Amino acid sequence: MAKKPKSNDKALAQNKKARHDYSILSTMEAGMVLTGTEIKSIRDRRVTLRDGYVQIRHGEAILMNVQINEYLQGNQFNHDPFRNRKLLLHKKEILKLQEETKNKGITIVPLKMYLKNGFAKVLIGVAKGKHEYDKRESLKKRDQQREIDRALKNR
């Protein structure tokens, strides 16, 4: 029996704040249009997804406000850290995202950035913002589940 090829998925950056501030309705994988120094910085894990979001403009999905720090060994041709980056999605996927975000309070946020077979990918999620009481409620549920797991483990 042939061996399965080893998966190359390697998480480089995660947006943990997004899972706290939003309830994720659906997720989708997208490629990105990058320059040479940007991919080198991504491989060095010099990425911040915290304030990022995706905007649909003129039939294109654009990743905005994501910081990819300058490449340390770069020269005068280094990239702008806050440059807007085009996401590579099929037309149907873009139309689906555009339709979902027409509702009030729905946005698209980057959840995770990783390498897949040498290409940088970003996992984006269609999300609905949580209220403060929803955040507290989800924290309580998580604590209760942790207590239950502890009690079952110590049995």
Curated annotation (Swiss-Prot):
Transmembrane segments: none
Pfam families named among the record's database cross-references: SmpB
GO molecular function, one term: RNA binding
Chief location category: cytoplasm
Taxonomy, superkingdom: Bacteria
Record's keyword terms, sorted: Cytoplasm, RNA-binding
Gene Ontology CC entries for this record: cytosol
SUPFAM superfamilies hit by this protein: Small protein B (SmpB)
Subcellular location: Cytoplasm
UniProt-listed GO biological process terms: trans-translation
Disulfide bonds: none
Stretch list, region Disordered: 134-155
Family under the similarity heading: Belongs to the SmpB family.
NCBIfam families referenced in this protein's UniProt entry, alphabetically: PRK05422.1, smpB
Role summary: Required for rescue of stalled ribosomes mediated by trans-translation. Binds to transfer-messenger RNA (tmRNA), required for stable association of tmRNA with ribosomes. tmRNA and SmpB together mimic tRNA shape, replacing the anticodon stem-loop with SmpB. tmRNA is encoded by the ssrA gene; the 2 termini fold to resemble tRNA(Ala) and it encodes a 'tag peptide', a short internal open reading frame. During trans-translation Ala-aminoacylated tmRNA acts like a tRNA, entering the A-site of stalled ribosomes, displacing the stalled mRNA.
UniProt name for this protein: SsrA-binding protein
Gene: smpB
